[in-house]
Amino acid sequence: MPYSHNVELPPAVRSHLPEHAQDIYREAFNHAFAAHTADPRQEEAAHRIAWGAVKRRYVKEGDFWVERSS
């Protein structure tokens, strides 16, 4: 189920990630969801891919996700 807006993201994503990271998550999830239509674990795969996309740009420091240094 693709997400149109960040407010539709799972609570664990919304409550922990900054707005920009939520955008990355949503866009990566939607793209992966569309790309894995034949996969019976489509939604699970899309969530894994979305978290991977976030982790390429952000790192968790303590309780907060912060953008990686260039």
Question: Positions of the model-derived regions?
Answer:
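C-terminal alpha-helical interaction appendages
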Residues: 1-70
